[in-house]
Amino acid sequence: MTILVLGINHKTASVALREKVAFSDEKRLLALKQIKQTQLAESAVILSTCNRTEVYLHNKNVGPQNDEVWLDSCVQWFADIHQVDLEELKSCLYSQQNLQASRHLMRVASGLDSLILGEPQILGQVKQAYQMSEEYYSLHSDIGMMSTELSRLFQKTFATAKRVRTETHIGESAVSVAYAACSLARQIFDSLRNLNILLVGAGETIELVSRHLLRHGVNGLAIANRTLSRAEKLVEKLETTQKIDIFSLDRLSEGLKRADIVITSTGSPHVLISRNLIEQAQQMRHYKPMLIVDIAVPRDVEESAGEIESVYHYTVDDLHNIIQYNINQREQASQQAEHIIQQESADFFEWLKVHQFSNLIRNYRESAEIIRQDLLEKALQALQNGENTEQVLQELSHKLTKKLIHQPTQAMQTMVKAGNTEGLQAFSHAVKF
């Protein structure tokens, strides 16, 4: 085993467990440092989103005889760094290796393993995860650069995801978790046009939500974020003539008192909107219906918020039914995408196998070239000394054959003694006898 992925996602684990194993930027750096210091792997890439946490590792020194030991060590490390119970983690954890690992990454980056089938947002998240690891290894070159194998896998993955987008219809509709959140709002309220909508956060997900809402003619839009400058930049990116109010999180209670809909997605490690804060807002609003869609992991809204009168509280996990419709629409395109991924992952794995033994192949060829040059030099010298040309050529061909087949013959004898029938069959097929 040289390449391993292990992780959890929305299919295998609840939002509560996903919160526990999410990587903040600080913890990501700590993880990359630990992985290298403990020699768990040569290099790694950590993908942490609302719906999944995955660690991709490469260790060329792990062979078939100790791959299970390595896997166990990786799982134990994963549990330790997040301080979660090992058995609880194992019940939700999946792992893949080599060909299956490369295929899994390509499926993830192409949106085939997302909550919404084919959603494009994940590709950007995979690229960002790769870039963060690449930057880490560049800044810490004393511990080594990212391995060629892992780098090649991610570059191949990006090209594959682009091919899937180009050659299939899987990305024609703009669907994402953000789109699902907006769809939910349109299902609960007849019209969004005259409602006050509060967005908490200013990241990529909130940007997508904003664009969906503006396309549906929303007039009362406000954005709350920890830093006003980032919220201002988001409004600039939206390039809209619609007035959008922005304010910092210390005025969140004021925003809640005006909001009919709250959609939140921040990177906060703690709850931002408590039940008490919502209750105060609802009292001021005379308990008019309020929809809260919390698409952050860890969650931004206190879990018991849905118990408040006239409050409709949804998390990422609650969006499943809305998303299922989109999945059904994209099944046909996904089959074509799976075929592309099967081709590309097999192509990468063939490269990986050759690359692993590239030094062996190169050394064998260099050795053969040295033998050829040595024997040729002796033959030319013999001809210059006036020896019979046919005899010199016969001797040259005989010695060249004998020396070149010496190592392969020894290898065959070793395989015979070891009972390695698969190796012998592969060898006989290669030399066609």
Swiss-Prot record:
GO terms for molecular function: glutamyl-tRNA reductase activity; NADP binding. Its EC number is 1.2.1.70. Substrate binds at residues 49-52, 114, 119-121, 125. GO terms for biological process: protoporphyrinogen IX biosynthetic process from glutamate. The record marks 104 as: Important for activity. Pathway: Porphyrin-containing compound metabolism; protoporphyrin-IX biosynthesis; 5-aminolevulinate from L-glutamyl-tRNA(Glu): step 1/2. InterPro entries: 4pyrrol_synth_GluRdtase, 4pyrrol_synth_GluRdtase_dimer, 4pyrrol_synth_GluRdtase_N, GluRdtase_CS, GluRdtase_dimer_dom_sf, GluRdtase_N_sf, NAD(P)-bd_dom_sf, Shikm_DH/Glu-tRNA_Rdtase. It catalyses: (S)-4-amino-5-oxopentanoate + tRNA(Glu) + NADP(+) = L-glutamyl-tRNA(Glu) + NADPH + H(+). Keywords: NADP, Oxidoreductase, Porphyrin biosynthesis. Pfam families: GlutR_dimer (PF00745), GlutR_N (PF05201), Shikimate_DH (PF01488). The active site is at residue 50. It is an enzyme of class 1 (oxidoreductase). It comes from the Bacteria. CDD domains: NAD_bind_Glutamyl_tRNA_reduct (cd05213). The keyword Oxidoreductase applies. The keyword Iron-sulfur does not apply. NADP(+) binds at residues 201-206. Catalyzes the NADPH-dependent reduction of glutamyl-tRNA(Glu) to glutamate 1-semialdehyde (GSA). Possesses an unusual extended V-shaped dimeric structure with each monomer consisting of three distinct domains arranged along a curved 'spinal' alpha-helix. The N-terminal catalytic domain specifically recognizes the glutamate moiety of the substrate. The second domain is the NADPH-binding domain, and the third C-terminal domain is responsible for dimerization. During catalysis, the active site Cys acts as a nucleophile attacking the alpha-carbonyl group of tRNA-bound glutamate with the formation of a thioester intermediate between enzyme and glutamate, and the concomitant release of tRNA(Glu). The thioester intermediate is finally reduced by direct hydride transfer from NADPH, to form the product GSA. Belongs to the glutamyl-tRNA reductase family. Homodimer. This is Glutamyl-tRNA reductase.
